[in-house]
Structure formats: C-alpha cells, structure tokens
Amino acid sequence: LPEAQLDRFLMQVNIDYPAVEDELKIVQLVREENKKMLLQQGQEESVGREPSKIREPLISQHQVMQARREVLDQYMSPEVERYMVELVQATRTPERYHQELSEWIEWGGSPRASLALDRCAKAHAWLLERDFVSPEDLQQIAPDVLRHRILLSYTAESRGMDADEVIRRILELVPVP
C-alpha cells in the first residue's frame, strides 16, 4: 500500500507463532468450544427450536462504551504530551536528534502518528489499571504505532536495518520528561 494508506492503520503489531504448549492449549480450547456449540445446537433441535447462531456476548455494549470513556479520560500531563509529539517529530526532522537518524529515515510519521500514539498510550495505561499515561506507555507502544509510518532510506535498508531498530534509536535520543 502507498504510505498515505498505510498511515491510516492505527498500529502494525508483529505477532510471533505460539509456543508448542500454547498452541496445544489453543487446539484444546477450540475443540471444547466446538463440542459445546454442537451440544447446544443438539439440545435446541430436540425441543424444536432453530439452532442459535449468535452466542451470548462476553461483555455488554454498555461495558465496551464505558471502557472507551475511561480510556479517553486517561490523564496525560503536558510534559508527556510534548514527549509524544517529539517522538513523531524525530521521525520527520531526525537531524535535530542525530545525524545517523537523518541517514536512516526517508519519510517520517504524519500527524496521524501522534493521534495514534495518544489513543494507544491511553489504552495501554488503562489496561495496566492506571488513570494516567507515563512516558513508559509511549515507549511500549511506539514500535507498533510507528513501524509502518516510517519509510527507511536506501542506506538503512542496505545495512539490513528495520523500522524497529530506528524507533529504538529514536527512543534513546528523544529526552524523556
């Protein structure tokens, strides 16, 4: 996809294959769920009802909306907010931070990158049951949010670098509040 379309994705999360034990658990869980579903359909058919195709939700729509409100209400101090924007600025004007960065980045993140960092950092803090965003939240989610928004230079690619390495370097160079 062109950069402008890639930028519309909130995150690019890299997921490894599960370990053998984890994959065994997945197989066993899915097998049990399938058995439960078949059993439920059989019971419904025996009483003359059409088998259910819609399962009961694990959480209600109200709970989802409440969680979204709580995420949006996460506090981000002006210093952390500035740090967040500086991380994105470092992808656009890398020479301000280090000459090597400017040799590695052809194209940096747009304002959507800052918006995505804001949303994801707040969600990350909420998942950790905090009511504020810390620089560590931004550092944790920065690779997933920025990796598809940075176009590496030929120099970086010829050295075998990837976006995650460049982001790690940005996180080292941008001063943390």
Functional labels for PLM-detected ranges:
Residues 66, 75-78, 92-177:
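C-terminal engagement/docking regions of AAA+ P-loop ATPases
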Residues 33, 90-93:
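Active-site/binding-pocket entry motifs
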Residues 1-69, 78-86:
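Conserved AAA+ ATPase core "coupling" helix
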